[in-house]
């Protein structure tokens, strides 16, 4: 599968979330309204690009004719466990996947797309410990106060999200750690997903 652009990933996430929440794909007009496109035609162009990359199928003649192909390929394998992430590489690159766990994604709300092995104690005060497996819903649509998986330049971190204009604060849940401040005008910053649950590291032994 070819890598998705940031905008294509937003469209894909929106389609998947809409199916998860309503049981049906969004219309082109709904995609355009949600993501601020000027017209449904712009949404259609992004959907065609996703189809060319093999992650969706467009069913002709239906306003909601969108099928997610990527979900069908991966759902039988279980949730991928992401370990240490190499600088500059996509989070879900094959080389980062340590294994798959047979965990029902629907145990989490919204559903989990992958597990991330936690490194460090910066979030210990809300029960996220070193070595735990964090269940993550892959999306870039997050709100202030939510716990997110974020990438700053080439570093991936788990923190509580707060944004005001072009300033983002990533706040630890441990007084020993200072907030990470990101200037969106000067630094590369990406939301990789939303934390939706945690599995104790001892639960697997």
Swiss-Prot record:
Q: What keywords sit in the KW lines?
A: Autocatalytic cleavage, DNA damage, DNA repair, DNA replication, DNA-binding, Hydrolase, Repressor, SOS response, Transcription, Transcription regulation
A Pfam family: LexA_DNA_bind
Q: What is its EC number?
A: 3.4.21.88
Question: Catalysed reaction per UniProt?
Answer: Hydrolysis of Ala-|-Gly bond in repressor LexA
| Annotated DNA-binding residue span(s) | 28-48
Q: Where is this site: Cleavage?
A: 87-88
Coiled-coil positions: none
- Indicate yes or no for the key word Transferase: no
Q: Where is the active site?
A: 122 (for autocatalytic cleavage activity), 159 (for autocatalytic cleavage activity)
Q: Which family does it belong to?
A: Belongs to the peptidase S24 family.
Assembly and partners?
Homodimer.
Name under which the protein is recorded: LexA repressor
Species name: Providencia rettgeri
